[in-house]
Amino acid sequence: MTLTDDTTTAQNSRHGDPIEVARELTRKWQTTVVERDKAGGSATEEREDLRASGLLSVTVPRHLGGWGADWPTALEVVREIAKVDGSLGHLFGYHLSTPAVIDLWGSPEQKERLLRQLAENNWWTGNASSENNSHILDWKVTATPADDGGYFFNGIKHFSSGAKGSDLLLVFGVIPEGFPQQGAIVAAAIPTTREGVQPNDDWQALGMRRTDSGTTEFHNVAVRPDEVLGKPNAILEAFLASGRGSLFGPIVQLVFSSVYLGIARGALETAREYTRTQARPWTPAGVTQAVEDPYTIRSYGEFGIQLQAADAAAREAAQLLQAAWDKGDALTSQERGELMVQISGVKAIATQAALDVTSRIFEVIGARGTHPKYGFDRFWRNIRTHTLHDPVSYKIAEVGNYVLNQRYPIPGFTS
């Protein structure tokens, strides 16, 4: 299929239900997910499936060529994808953060141009923000001012999910010493193919094996003035203002929660099928089928209750996020704070439920279910890996600080 064919197919599909489009894709991926997870590497074919589906522009407004879907719908798509393939759910969820950043921090011209191009060309986006230094905001990648008002980026980013194979890259750097505004953060959206950008094939981890979350190097990468999102430190100013521009943290945390809940739901449904068709009852149970074992039934009840509660909380938070998004510049710091408290709670519940379900499904499938051919371990490995992104204890503390002291979470990249 040519790029033109991909574009036409994607544009034609944007009049349907994006959730059903996601389900159709996952039915295709279901039969190969275990083998693909074992192999690791890049999810090139599956990413092209997503490109051709048109889902990459699910949150782009319709007048700019996208689906125009709301956040509850987009997050449901994340859950559907993650339910079958955690790595793809991870990649797609991270992809959604870039159109959001462009909308939140870009100029009107940048929003019009970049979001339209994203929709018309079915761009994948990647990110290059995290670094492996003394703390999470100890950034060493430099953004050296250029004479034309742009910058030259130099350094190495880590955990660059989706950078490899992407078309547009969201990157952050700091102005080095010796220049006005030294230490200020510069954000930019640049073509991944720009000279000097080098996404590396060096990602290794317990889980999320096919997310290409390795390093990305920047060798004197030229960033044009019209690719810079806002002025230096505009991001921190947006966080301090605690208005619409600070919604990046809530969006990312709810995306993460949706990935977790999708993976957990996938683990539950896959284990249920195994229990129904292959598991054996324990002799003292006095039953002939595993599905009649009272302890197995109880375990599934516990799994279902946890996910029922977490799903309900996540969907409520998604509605609140959409309401905050729609308020635009009228969003108050109080409304933003209340939203983040809700999402912090969702993140905590989703993390706990997903870790419990993905580790305990082995109790209801039995020893034979641990054979590598079934791949049940992938659910827990993916959850355990990604839930280490930012400590859930701090999300619980954010809720606790609000309940006890009526203090809202401090706006930032993760809150």
Curated annotation (Swiss-Prot):
Gene3D superfamilies xrefs: Acyl-CoA dehydrogenase/oxidase, N-terminal domain, Butyryl-CoA Dehydrogenase, subunit A, domain 2, Butyryl-CoA Dehydrogenase, subunit A, domain 3
GO CC terms of this entry: cytoplasm
MF terms in GO: 3-methylbutanoyl-CoA dehydrogenase activity; flavin adenine dinucleotide binding; monooxygenase activity
One Pfam match: Acyl-CoA_dh_2
Reaction equations catalysed: dibenzothiophene + 2 FMNH2 + 2 O2 = dibenzothiophene 5,5-dioxide + 2 FMN + 2 H2O + 2 H(+); dibenzothiophene + FMNH2 + O2 = dibenzothiophene 5-oxide + FMN + H2O + H(+); dibenzothiophene 5-oxide + FMNH2 + O2 = dibenzothiophene 5,5-dioxide + FMN + H2O + H(+)
Biological role stated in the UniProt entry: Catalyzes the first step of the '4S' desulfurization pathway that removes covalently bound sulfur from dibenzothiophene (DBT) without breaking carbon-carbon bonds. Sulfur dioxygenase which converts DBT to DBT-sulfone (DBTO2 or DBT 5,5-dioxide) probably in a stepwise manner. In addition to FMNH2 can also use FAD (although FAD is less efficient).
The protein's name: Dibenzothiophene monooxygenase
Organism: Mycolicibacterium goodii
